[in-house]
């Protein structure tokens, strides 16, 4: 049987912001969002890219595999480190989903769909100064009671 090229695999990349500005409560919201992605969306693979101002760790999951929550790292936020990693790996993801507090600058728009999953209290100022409002779908995560 011929092997499949990475670009043929239906995959999603989740850029998980693990910078110092992301608190424990927001990490819990991210965890809930990741759980929904794993349960509801039929990707062959999901890559979780933990990033701050650089990629800290990449974990690859196959469909149905349970995921582990990330460690916390410290530092600033550079969204472009995730898109750079995607390009370096030669991936053509079905989508890129950022889970972030929005404190950083959005990279140039890539050739694949992008969603920005943000804290429920994210304000317009953060969206505009980061450039997140320029492309992609903005999703405010719901607080879990």
Residues covered by each model-derived region:
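C-terminal region signature
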Residues: 136-138
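Short, structured coil segments at secondary-structure junctions
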Residues: 110-112, 134
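Redox- and metal-dependent alpha/beta enzyme cores, enriched for Fe-S-associated oxidoreductases
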Residues: 18-19, 25-67
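Acidic, polar low-complexity linker/tail segments
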Residues: 1-13, 22-25
